[in-house]
Amino acid sequence: MKEIQAIYVDLKKLRNIGIMAHIDAGKTTTTERILFYTGRKHNIGSVDDGTATMDWMVQEKERGITIVSAATTCMWKDHRINIIDTPGHVDFTIEVERALRVLDGAVAVFDAAAGVEPQSETVWRQADKYNVPRIAFMNKMDKLGADFEMAVQTMVDRLKANPIPVQMPMGAEDSFEGVIDLIEMKAIRWLNENGTEMVYEEIPEKYRAKAEEMREDLLEKVAELDDEIMMLYLEGEEISNDLIKKALRKATIENKATPVFCGSAKMNRGVQPLLDGILEYLPSPLDMPPVRGWNQNGEEVQIKPSEDEPFTALAFKIQADPYVGKLTFFRVYSGRLEKGSYVYNSTKGKKERISRLIFMHADKREDVEYVRAGDIVAAIGLKDTKTGDTLCDEKRPVILEKMEFPEPVISIAIEPETKNDQDKLSKALTLLSDEDPSFRAYVDHETGETIISGMGELHLEIIVDRLKREFNTKVRVGQPQVAYRETIQEPAEAEGKYIRQSGGRGQYGHVIMRFEPIDLSKTFEFEDRIVGGVIPKEYIPAVEEGVREAAQSGVLAGYPMVGIKAILLDGSYHEVDSSEMAFKIAASMAFKEAVKKAKPILLEPIMRVEVTTPEEYMGNIIADLNSRRAHVETLESRGHLRIIKALVPLSEMFGYATDLRSLSQGRATYTMVLERYAKVPDKLAEKIISK
């Protein structure tokens, strides 16, 4: 086992990358092979038989999909590569967003027979949002239907990307025999089954013309991105390979191009050149712009990737660990941190001590003495730190940009089977919601039930599974419930007056407020229009708090209210009797009064559903979607497959996975993400409200 500890590499030799893909594109296998060839792992794991290193949670081993982004470190040609494994299933896009925040670059893995699939589009858009430079790997070149040029074209058509193949395959499907490097103009062949022996040789005659044509394409595309190459190209001068690589690296880091590689990870072909590509084209922390942060005065500060700067890091993942309690994963942006020292959590305003620092290798771990700028590391000992918190040096407190997390759309009631399970359940739910900000757990005060909510049925299934397995807590599970919301349609004003006089000090709070509908994507806004101090400044936050709390339970059916702007217009106070509590109660009275007059309505989550199906099942699937109140937007053809894009209310989608399987004999697949909230039809709303 090569010891990583001693090898603190120079920053320019560090790569922090993610491997992102659609659920079946072979991402885990690609990661596995990377670990194998970089000497971190002595037997080749396979998803199909459940031995893959990165998929280390039991549930992942059974389902064959990656759920938790484990961070792994490995060495290749005296560079250190930190890999963050990201899930490909749409219910876990939160994990993907989180990983993308702390990466410098990514490898996008595609299935060469399918090209860009729906989830690849989602993940690609998220990577665009965080400006993550990417290279692409067309995997599964040995699969039936593999077509390199078609797959590359889908990157243009569906992702609006600028793919530049730096390799082409020799053959495809059964006859896939290796790859051609279009920059060096050499063929690469693998001599043994596990792919450890490879040779560079002359390009076979039958591929020569195609390779020359594709190299010409490559030169043309690179010339468009680089003035120096453009000049040489137009003058017909020789363009050196180093110059091509340099220009391509610059374009990749600026997100103007995506170099494309190909191979078959499962057949152990193409992985070492992909590793070279990670070093060649993806950025080191030094190539990235400085990270932005804000100091205590709210002024922007630039955080430079240097060991000499004060320490700054972002916690991007909390993982409950059966052995050590809680692991906090963070990315160090500047400075250096020794184990046993204190860090300042500027988000919470608290000091915490780090007892151990660990480099993770999927589910094995190595203790290290210190970490520094660029590192991705797990720490033990941080009790109060949550996902998205900034850790820094107390002498230079700074807050990095906050992470934003989506609201859950689906809930189920769960109850412990025995009294003994009750205590275990509340502890486990606390740990799980620390770990995953898109998962919520709370007790419904009216019914006394424990409600858990998340991003989809699979998300909650996995949570329930973990409760049983990891936390040994037996629970009974109710039917999934839709997370409805309520809102108002018209502006309304109301007065809230709370006065109590009962011996000694009284209570006095008085507000006049206006409530207006705003865009439903915004939960709540508050505006203070008080002039002349008719309500003193110190009570204003209590007014906002009162409205926020009241908005948690709407007037129609007790669902949280969204899309409301609260404006505090006027009011009065009493020198002695006024208190924060009195203003909080007065504000909630005004809110409840106004909402009744503002034409409240019930809202439901509308999901963007994309079904991919062989043509022969399309008619039945569309008929079924229509029976679910769907609005079918578009139909697309992709080879022999049809893609149906529709908007469907979530309440109609329960159990859809099973129904779709029976409609298509298991051949159709679908993805579903929240699009927006919309008004529930009146008849249905009456039913929901009467419940």
Curated annotation (Swiss-Prot):
Under the heading InterPro entries, the entry gives: EFG_II, EFG_III, EFG_III/V, EFG_IV, EFG_V, EFG_V-like, EFTu-like_2, G_TR_CS
**One Gene Ontology term, aspect cellular component:** cytoplasm
Subcellular location(s): the record lists: Cytoplasm
Q: Which residues bind GTP?
A: 21-28, 85-89, 139-142
UniProt record, GO biological process: ribosome disassembly
Q: Which UniProt keywords apply?
A: Cytoplasm, Elongation factor, GTP-binding, Nucleotide-binding, Protein biosynthesis
**Ranges for the tr-type G domain?**
12-286
The molecular function terms in GO held by this entry are:
GTP binding; GTPase activity; translation elongation factor activity
Main subcellular localisation? cytoplasm
Q: Does the keyword 4Fe-4S apply?
A: no
- Cystine connections: none
Protein family (similarity comment) = Belongs to the TRAFAC class translation factor GTPase superfamily. Classic translation factor GTPase family. EF-G/EF-2 subfamily.
- Role description: Catalyzes the GTP-dependent ribosomal translocation step during translation elongation. During this step, the ribosome changes from the pre-translocational (PRE) to the post-translocational (POST) state as the newly formed A-site-bound peptidyl-tRNA and P-site-bound deacylated tRNA move to the P and E sites, respectively. Catalyzes the coordinated movement of the two tRNA molecules, the mRNA and conformational changes in the ribosome.
Name the PANTHER family on file: RIBOSOME-RELEASING FACTOR 2, MITOCHONDRIAL, TRANSLATION ELONGATION FACTOR G-RELATED
Name of this protein: Elongation factor G
Supply the source organism for this entry.
Answer: Thermosipho africanus (strain TCF52B)
Gene that encodes the chain: fusA
